[in-house]
């Protein structure tokens, strides 16, 4: 089956995520649209950190689509909206087609509510609040040139806000990993068996651990700071409580293992700690250095780079003998904005290869494309995806 993903603000990272998780031949078409194929399963919008919308190809025209919508929802009100992502878009096209659909369904005796937008695309916030593609009877049609895609849903901004800002233990001083980026890091590990044990050796307040649990994986974390381990335990306990375990669909078998999972969270230096048990994948944000409000001068930059490099490589050296061949490791390490306006990286790729790791290849992408940042951000995150030889 053919699918369309509407990527967020960093489409190349979203492309890598979809290639790793769903289809290694996924392609970027246009500025932020990704086409991919998947058999025997449906992609899930709430699984992807880098996609704003997701649609499944409908093999037919608008006339056939009207019949399909009528059959999908035999009774009750229908809500419909259209987003046009075509290369050549005509003014008023989405409104005109929406009205045609409303009239056609009206002739079939159906009550129809149309969601419109001043722009060719319905904003993600509007689509989410109207549950387009998520609630029975609520549809968004994604138009791409001559193809029509039926929405499978929009990124759930309400759930992200809750997982980011409502959880009980947060600490702005240590930096805050966005849940979306945590999802991306885990997904870049590729498909993993259900219940796979995912390690975050720099777990902080537990964002990667939280997102791993929501995906059905067993979270395992350590951190140098005792306070961070306490925060991770509080946040996972919050996630596993009766309300949130239902809200975020935590698997019952994980809830049953809650106490064992919390007990395994430990204080430990990632460069020396000896982790117990099987580790199926590793996903983490490494130490990013001191917070900065402007590009660092050379002396400061060199000192921060040396410290961050020592920690990241020290961890890899430590964990290499503890994991099996083929184990994926996905890490976000710092890159610093310089006065030139470009980011300077840690330059650890050759060293990582010497340690016995292969770099995952992504079609039409290079390592320089995997830089996660916001406009003007001083410390960006370079994402590195490797697998033990």
Language model features with spans:
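Extreme N-terminal starter segment of soluble prokaryotic enzymes
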Residues: 1-4
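Non-catalytic nucleic-acid substrate-recognition regions in nucleic-acid-modifying enzymes
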Residues: 6-9, 14-139
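Conserved beta strand-loop-helix elements of the APE1-like EEP
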Residues: 38-41, 145, 384-389
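Class I S-adenosyl-L-methionine
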Residues: 73, 91-92, 96-198, 381
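Conserved S-adenosyl-L-methionine
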Residues: 178-273, 281
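Mobile active-site "lid"/loop adjacent to the S-adenosyl-L-methionine
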Residues: 226-228, 242, 247-249, 284-314
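C-terminal catalytic and target-recognition region of SAM-dependent MTase-like enzymes
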Residues: 278, 291, 312, 328-389
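A short glycine-rich, Lys/Arg-flanked "PGG" loop and its adjoining helix->strand segment in the class I
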Residues: 309-325
């Amino acid at each position: 089956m053919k699918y369309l993903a509407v990527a967020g603000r960093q489409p190349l990272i979203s492309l890598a995520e979809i290639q790793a998780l769903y289809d290694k031949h996924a392609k970027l078409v246009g500025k932020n649209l990704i086409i991919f194929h998947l058999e025997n399963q449906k992609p899930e919008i709430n699984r992807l950190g880098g996609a704003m919308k997701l649609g499944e190809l409908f093999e037919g025209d608008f006339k056939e689509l009207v019949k399909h919508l009528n059959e999908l929802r035999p009774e009750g009100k229908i809500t419909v909206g259209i987003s046009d992502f075509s290369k050549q878009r005509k003014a008023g096209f989405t409104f005109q087609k929406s009205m045609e659909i409303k009239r056609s369904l009206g002739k079939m005796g159906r009550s129809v509510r149309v969601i419109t937008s001043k722009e060719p695309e319905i904003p993600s916030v509007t689509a989410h609040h109207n549950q387009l593609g998520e609630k029975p009877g609520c549809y968004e049609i994604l138009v791409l040139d001559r193809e029509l895609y039926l929405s499978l849903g929009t990124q759930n901004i309400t759930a992200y806000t809750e997982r980011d800002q409502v959880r009980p233990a947060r600490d702005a001083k240590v930096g805050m990993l966005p849940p979306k980026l945590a999802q991306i890091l885990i997904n870049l590990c590729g498909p993993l068996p259900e219940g796979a044990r995912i390690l975050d050796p720099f777990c902080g307040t537990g964002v990667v651990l939280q997102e791993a649990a929501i995906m059905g994986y067993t979270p395992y974390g350590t951190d140098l700071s005792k306070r961070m381990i306490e925060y991770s335990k509080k946040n996972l306990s919050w996630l596993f409580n009766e309300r949130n375990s239902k809200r975020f669909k935590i698997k019952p078998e994980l809830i049953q293992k809650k106490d064992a999972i919390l007990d395994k969270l430990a204080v430990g230096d990632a460069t020396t700690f000896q982790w117990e048990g099987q580790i199926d994948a590793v996903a983490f944000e490494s130490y990013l250095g001191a917070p900065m409000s402007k590009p660092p001068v050379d002396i400061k930059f060199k000192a921060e780079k040396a410290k961050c490099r020592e920690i990241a490589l020290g961890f890899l050296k430590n964990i290499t003998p503890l994991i099996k061949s083929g184990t994926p490791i996905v890490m976000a390490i710092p890159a610093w904005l310089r006065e030139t306006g470009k980011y300077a990286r840690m330059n650890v790729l050759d060293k990582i290869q010497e340690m016995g790791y292969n770099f995952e290849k992504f079609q039409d992408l290079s390592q320089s494309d995997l830089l996660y940042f916001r406009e003007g951000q001083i410390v960006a995150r370079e994402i590195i995806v490797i697998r033990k030889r």
